[in-house]
């Protein structure tokens, strides 16, 4: 594990809001090593911070930027105009990036960056329903399609809700929270973020001195389930593996342990290291051809200077790898299992 030098982020624009500051930007650019003409793919466009930096890396760098959120795509129109034809914005999921770039008549990419999870823009907009700090409709959908968080909260069985909160939110009181949700929805639907946050806070007591809101883990679990975030990450890693040229590089920024575990196991297995065991994986998979070599030997963490400017960067971790000329192996089932809820095996210990 390495932390970026304190001086590495001194140039961060203090006048901008944190939502416009891409996390670990200097470290991502160093890991990608954009030293030649080529195609870069930003799989998570958001506010365009990484895309802008990719364009500025060199006049012969072309960029395809992907986002499932139509609001983000609309917000990037000016950047497309300013790019002089070097930027294409594509609405879609980065788990389909191989298909999406093929639709743009591109077969392979030289660099890919993935910034995993919800964007600051989505969190800060109350109407998107991601945050317990602002009251809004209980939505949480990144792309606006599919069941919302309210649909899950008001429609799923108690055991399924408990599993979502426990495995995706790492909420130790998951069964108690799920029970409280079911009891509350019998009286009236749970429709707003404030309703849910207050409900969870009545069950989960904050740890003394901790700044973490009691509803943090429950909101994380629901958001991951609504958007299939871990499944999307797994598909994105495999898609990147298929389209990167030999010598091409993949940089992935994660923000919590569930994401980082998947990325770590992917690079570990694909670089020839032994896959890591987990509670979901009964055994270790047979070694596959080495399709990546590690660029970062462990997670790269933000510097103190960056966390001073952007407190949301504190939990960020960067891992990166360089594609070899080995053919892409079949998808790694160990990380696919990490991305889904385990099959029911009895009630187990009380949570």
Curated annotation (Swiss-Prot):
- InterPro entries reported for this sequence: RsmH, SAM-dep_MeTrfase_MraW_recog, SAM-dependent_MTases_sf
A GO MF term: rRNA (cytosine-N4-)-methyltransferase activity
Task: Give the span(s) annotated as Disordered.
Answer: 274-351
Give me the residues that bind S-adenosyl-L-methionine, please: 48-50, 67, 94, 115, 122
| Catalyzed reactions per annotation | cytidine(1402) in 16S rRNA + S-adenosyl-L-methionine = N(4)-methylcytidine(1402) in 16S rRNA + S-adenosyl-L-homocysteine + H(+)
> From which domain of life does this come?
Bacteria
* Root EC class: transferase
Q: List the disulfide bonds.
A: none
UniProt keyword annotations, A-Z: Cytoplasm, Methyltransferase, rRNA processing, S-adenosyl-L-methionine, Transferase
Q: Which GO terms describe its biological process?
A: rRNA base methylation
What's the protein here called?
Ribosomal RNA small subunit methyltransferase H
